[in-house]
Amino acid sequence: MTTASSSASQLQQRLPEEKPWPQLSGSNADAQTFKCKYVTNHNSLGDGNFSVVKECMNIHTKDLYAMKLIKKQTVKNKIQLIQREFDLLRSISEKIRDMEKKNEHSLDIFEGHHHILQLFDYFETADNIVLITQLCQKGDLYEKIVENQCLDLETQVTSYCACLVSVLEFLHSQGIVHRDLKAENVLFRLRVNENEKNLQGEHHGDFKYDLLAHDLVLADFGLAAEYNTSKVNSLKEFVGTISYIAPEIVKCKGVGEMTPDQVGKLDKYGCPVDIWALGVLTYFMAFGYTPFDCTTDDETLECISKCDYYVDEQMMHDPKYEQFWNFVQCCFTIDPAVRRSAKNLKQHPFIKDYFATSNSLNTKDTPNFSFHPTIRRVSSTASMHTLRSPSKSRKTTTLAYLNMDGGSSETSTAFSSKMDLPDLYVDRTINSRERSLNRIRDTLKKTLSMTSLKPAGTFDYLHANKNGTSLSSSKSGLVKKNSTFVLDPKPPKNSLMNGCFSTTPESRSNFNTPKTLSRQGSSTSVKKYVNEVDLLLTPRTASMSSNDTTAINDYDTTNDKNPARKHAASFQVNVDDSDGDETMQI
């Protein structure tokens, strides 16, 4: 026994340690390498300083996806952010798959785990880190709001808000804080593969709402963090989008210049920051402008700290908006310990109809939403609120990366385009929104953002137990009404890259006749598969909206009606640059 145990111990010592993905090696001699199993369209869906997103086809399954190629050369000091995003997406995808396998469903209209961007595959090349995700429509929630000036309160704002509440409830139940919930990160599913369903055209319940709410997908987990497993200081970072950040994040401003003792005195924030951002987004959907934005970033941050947001006098006294104002008040609570949770908000009168089943099972825990006082103004040094849609355009931004464990920091500067739009300045004494909107002047100030399945998914309403979960198997032919979520069975391993190193990173195809490949090096990758590619596919356009100022999700989309405009802002983030340049082949 001793000899055997000793031999096993020696063998274990000789075995190479499993290296975390990505390897970040140009040669990667120790890792198994494969030729790329995807072909991409010639045109990119969007590109930016750090990454390019393209539509791609898996040459084995012929399904269409979005391929995000993150440039190693530009993210070398931020690789841990990409690793964090990848780890979270993979963990969430596995959890979703497990829930669908166990048929864990409720009878509510929205299931939170059905509305999160799905990660399908991932791999590394000499130049890029590549993520394969689901394909989404061109145009995000931001563009939808701006094109329509605002959304309909009763059919769109309530349903979109309810869907996002279900998403946050799921994420928070898994201990995950998103930290960058905003309109640009809310996408719409694009159903392009054979097994994906179309809306049935029927409403669930006895009230009408926009069925596109079933297509909502929350994306960009570049800033997301696990509340219970993150480093002690990772949730003391000044990160996010200025228009959407909560007061507890504002307190972290300048954390990069703080001493370890000062950092230690900061309170760790958590899931309530997403609830605050939800309030901002709900307000933005209803009015077409954000509640706290002022002339300068400092004024905006002061208004956030004091919960001083613009309230239109006419809208405030409109009975139609009564529950809306109460809902955003629940979100705009300065003390995060008192701020409502996503689970509580499901029972709020503003959106409770979308969760009638689960709410009926939790009547004893129904919170009281009637205690809030009348909305009041808070005096601050900011004399003007800026009524505007938060701009998607970008400006020169200084990014400070903070190594909070080591007490050191470094800064770098990212340059991007600038687009000017009119500002809407509103004096606090004006009583009419319409009068305020006539006072257009100056230039839109920029705000910051840091960043960036198939058969199954069935649910039997007829065999649900008293807890609202299904007792039937996934073989039932019934599906959740109007839900457009589908979960792929695990694809065959030979059709995936699964984190390997690819010798041919990008095989391009025009997805059409004739069969053309953009470069000779790529043609060798798909030579034996090229006859399998469906040459009848026509080019499609889609987009995964995100931001161009980070190493995670950075690209733009434009259309004729609304040129793409991205957020911009200054931020500090905890990054351990332990990999070093020597591990990267640039």
UniProtKB/Swiss-Prot annotation:
Gene Ontology biological-process annotations: cellular response to oxidative stress; signal transduction
Pfam families registered for this protein in UniProt: Pkinase
Keyword Glycosyltransferase recorded: no
Disulfide bonds, paired cysteine numbers: none
Sites of Phosphothreonine modification: T504, T538
InterPro entries, per the entry: Kinase-like_dom_sf, Prot_kinase_dom, Protein_kinase_ATP_BS, Ser/Thr_kinase_AS
EC number from the UniProt entry: 2.7.11.1
Summary of the knockout phenotype: Leads to cell death when overexpressing the camptothecin mimetic TOP1-T(722)A mutant.
Keywords of the record: ATP-binding, Cytoplasm, Kinase, Nucleotide-binding, Nucleus, Phosphoprotein, Serine/threonine-protein kinase, Transferase
GO cellular component term of the entry, any: nucleus
Protein kinase domain mapped to chain residues: 39-351
Subcellular location: Cytoplasm; Nucleus
Entry-annotated residues carrying Phosphoserine: S509, S518, S578
Top EC group: transferase
Note: Present with 10200 molecules/cell in log phase SD medium.
Task of the protein: Serine/threonine protein kinase shown to have protein phosphorylation activity in vitro.
Protein name: Serine/threonine-protein kinase TDA1
Gene assigned in the entry: TDA1
